[in-house]
């Protein structure tokens, strides 16, 4: 399944993997997974984190390596996000709950993920998704952006 990914997708997933792999050792542990999820406003229990790791950990060593991560991401792409998942993702970004993702909200979430973006990069991301030109991203624009990926 992972062999059906484009080079661009693999490159993007490598970047995402490195956000999780905080110590850069090539594996994601439950501790690293928990850190990223908490930075996104989730609060998983140790058991939930272990379940997530076990679901992806095909070689049974207790951690996720990049090939296992790619398999998961390929599966996620194939399953295309359900509306519920999209709403949940939108809420992570829309911190004040006003129905719009502002540049500040986008910058905050990306910084929590360890992505240090310049103001120009944040503005560019907003511009790319902002169909109606109001300077922020509404739910409809967010869905179009996520489906287009």
Curated annotation (Swiss-Prot):
PTM annotation (N-acetylalanine): residues: 2
Name where it mostly resides: cytoplasm
Q: Any idea which positions bind Ca(2+) 2?
A: 57, 59, 61, 63, 68
Intracellular or extracellular location(s): Cytoplasm
Q: Which UniProt keywords apply?
A: Acetylation, Calcium, Cytoplasm, Metal-binding, Repeat
Ranges for domain EF-hand come to 8-43, 44-79, 81-116, 117-149
CDD domains linked: EFh
Q: Which InterPro entries match?
A: CALM/Myosin/TropC-like, EF-hand-dom_pair, EF_Hand_1_Ca_BS, EF_hand_dom
Which SUPFAM superfamilies did the record assign? EF-hand
Binding sites annotated in the UniProt record for Ca(2+) 3: 94, 96, 98, 100, 105
State what this protein does.
Calmodulin mediates the control of a large number of enzymes, ion channels and other proteins by Ca(2+). Among the enzymes to be stimulated by the calmodulin-Ca(2+) complex are a number of protein kinases and phosphatases.
Other notes:
Calmodulin is not involved in the mechanism of chloroquine resistance.
Name the family the entry cites: Belongs to the calmodulin family.
The molecule here is called Calmodulin
């Amino acid at each position: 399944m992972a062999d059906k990914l484009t080079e661009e997708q693999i490159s993007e997933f490598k970047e995402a993997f490195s956000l999780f792999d905080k110590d850069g050792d090539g594996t994601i542990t439950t501790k690293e997974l928990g850190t990223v999820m908490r930075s996104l406003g989730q609060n998983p229990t140790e058991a939930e984190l272990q379940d997530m790791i076990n679901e992806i950990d095909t070689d049974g060593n207790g951690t996720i390596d990049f090939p296992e991560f790619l398999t998961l991401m390929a599966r996620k792409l194939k399953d295309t996000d359900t509306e519920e998942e999209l709403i949940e993702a939108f809420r992570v970004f829309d911190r004040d709950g006003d129905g719009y993702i502002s540049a500040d909200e986008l910058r905050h979430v990306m910084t929590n993920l360890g992505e240090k973006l310049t103001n120009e990069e944040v503005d560019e991301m907003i511009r790319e998704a902002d169909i109606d030109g109001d300077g922020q991203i509404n739910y409809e624009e967010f869905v179009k952006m996520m489906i287009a990926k």
